[in-house]
Amino acid sequence: MNFDMVKLQKAIALLAQQFQPEKVILFGSWAYGEPNPNSDVDLCVIKNTPNTRSLAREIDSSLFPRPFPIDLLVMTPKQMNDRLAINDYFVTEIIQKGKLLYAKR
């Protein structure tokens, strides 16, 4: 896969404008410097919403056409904090090793 940070930043800017998340974090192999030719772009979107699955589908649909495969994880701040409070390894790794691409001001 040909990962292009400029194209990703443009996609994040559109996502931020349209959905106004609190944060967007790049995680996984591209963030951790361990990508392989089949790696997708993993994004964690933090937004206070009543239905994270519905929002994930909306965001997913808005990101077409895609220059590379994207895998989305949408969480509310409460979900994120609850999982951090129980030392959830996956969420802790996203926070500790991920790259913050967007934060609401």
Report each predicted region and the residues it spans:
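Conserved H-loop
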Residues: 29
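Catalytic core of pol beta-like nucleotidyltransferases
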Residues: 1-23, 32-37, 47-105
